[in-house]
């Protein structure tokens, strides 16, 4: 069975939003970044991570949030990536279209997902190795 380990939301100011969630819920910060593509903060409760991201407006992506801010996707840690993907596809999941940006250029995050899928209009990631739940020393 897959386990939800990552939830990603978008916010106008991820740095301010992260401070609010840290104060309100006692979440711990794992990392943050400010690259040419996005401002981002990664929080955790030690079990599930919360990614708070704001993609920057670029020539290629002048309006990254046509529908506003909020839930973007969730990530599931699975034991067997291939069988989990096959099971999801059998249920109707399809590949997400490629993002409009090169995610490898993000400053504050290692790319933990291995498969990006959509099911019933909801985006989710699958990962066989999971997400970091503590700050790297």
Give the positions of each predicted feature:
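N-terminal beta-strand motif that seeds the catalytic metal site of vicinal oxygen chelate
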Residues: 1-18, 71-78, 127-137
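Core segments of cupin and vicinal oxygen chelate
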Residues: 2, 9-50, 90, 98, ...
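Vicinal oxygen chelate
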Residues: 76, 85-137
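A generic structural micro-feature
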Residues: 44, 65-68
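A cross-kingdom feature marking solvent-exposed beta-strand/loop segments within repeated
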Residues: 59-61
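Short, conserved charged micro-motifs
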Residues: 16, 81-86
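Conserved beta-strand in the GNAT
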Residues: 51-53, 125
């Amino acid at each position: 069975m897959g386990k939800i380990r990552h939830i990603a939301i978008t916010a106008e100011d991820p740095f301010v939003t992260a401070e609010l969630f840290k104060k309100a819920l006692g979440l711990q910060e794992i990392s943050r970044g400010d690259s040419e593509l996005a401002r981002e903060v990664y929080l955790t409760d030690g079990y599930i991570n919360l990614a708070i991201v704001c993609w920057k407006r670029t020539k290629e992506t002048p309006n990254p949030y046509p529908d506003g801010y909020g839930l973007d996707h969730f990530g599931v840690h699975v034991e067997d990536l291939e069988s989990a993907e096959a099971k999801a596809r059998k249920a109707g999941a399809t590949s997400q279209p490629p993002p409009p940006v090169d995610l490898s250029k993000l400053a504050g995050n290692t790319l933990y997902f291995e498969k990006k899928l959509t099911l019933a209009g909801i985006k989710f990631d699958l990962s066989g190795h999971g997400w970091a739940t503590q700050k790297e020393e």
